[in-house]
Regions:
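Fe(II)/2-oxoglutarate oxygenase catalytic core
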Residues: 2-255, 259-286
Length: 286
């Protein structure tokens, strides 16, 4: 099958044209897409609608085991009854726009912070795939930042200082930053994990910063200095020259590599407009 890749940014991101992904089954075709992910880190399709079962099937064909340990799973079953299909929306189980004080909505607001999916579990997330089902009539973009280019742009002294450090990641921390509180039982399920601050990508050998708002501290440093370092690195890594903003349209499908990027949702009036997307994320295992 023939795929065409059109770069959308000087460092990363490409728009893909070619066959419907529901029809992509051959190992060679899937390998071609994975090679493109190694190069671009974010791939964008337009006019690529999915039914839920089709998206789940493709995600498993593309990269295997799916992540199902989201913060919303701790708050209760999602409206699809399958935690491997993350409900990225402002819609409740009755099909209504969520109330302003709905805990799921309040938790999801933290997605406006820069993050990488599932860095707070072991194994973490590898590829995330987001399918646009209902898009508001106003901009409600997702921004992506290239962590490989951000690493490349660091000076040699900073690289040497940070390359062997580790950060503790917890989704409870990133939610608490914005005032969301989990109860004791919920916190027990969200203890978090330690991740390297810098990762080496296995197929390319490129290095990338591994950052997220979930990162609460640097394990090897005192908490104040570690948090200041994390803030400085996120500020560096999200400079405009490293960022691509995706304007969503119904039928868009975007895959990104969580080892190579961070992303964040941009705000819109979620009390006036519906926004429904479905996300699948694979686990970073061999």
């Amino acid at each position: 099958m023939r795929f065409t890749f059109r770069p959308l940014h000087p460092h990363f991101v490409a728009e893909v044209t070619g066959p419907r992904l529901q029809d992509v089954h051959e190992p060679a075709d899937l390998a071609r897409l994975r090679a493109a992910m190694d190069q671009y880190a974010v791939l964008v399709w337009h006019d690529q609608p999915f039914a839920d079962d089709e998206q789940l099937d493709f995600a498993q064909r593309f990269d295997g085991v799916l992540h199902a340990r989201t913060s919303l799973a701790v708050l209760g079953r999602n409206r699809f009854g399958n935690d491997a299909l993350t409900d990225v929306s402002n819609v409740d189980e009755h099909g209504d726009i969520m109330a302003a004080d709905d805990r799921r909505r309040v938790s999801s607001v933290s997605n406006r912070l820069w993050h990488t999916d599932a860095s707070f579990v072991d194994p973490p997330g590898r590829y995330s795939m987001l399918s646009a089902r209902v898009i508001p009539p106003v901009r409600a973009d997702t921004e992506f930042a290239d962590m490989r280019a951000a690493w490349d742009a660091l000076d040699a002294e900073t690289r040497a200082q940070i390359e062997h450090l580790h950060a503790h990641h917890s989704i409870a921390y990133s939610r608490q930053v914005l005032g969301f509180e989990f109860d004791a039982a919920e916190r027990d399920k969200l203890a978090g994990v330690v991740q390297p601050l810098v990762r080496t990508l296995p197929r390319t050998g490129r290095r990338a910063l591994y950052l997220a708002s979930h990162a609460s501290r640097i394990v090897e440093w005192p908490v104040p200095e570690g948090r200041l370092l994390l803030r400085d690195l996120i500020e560096h890594a999200t400079r405009p020259e490293f960022v691509y903003a995706h304007e969503w349209h119904v039928g868009d499908f975007v895959i990104w590599d969580n080892r190579s990027t961070m992303h964040r949702a941009r705000p819109f009036d979620d009390r006036a407009h519906r926004r429904e997307l479905r996300r699948t994320t694979t686990l970073d295992i061999d």
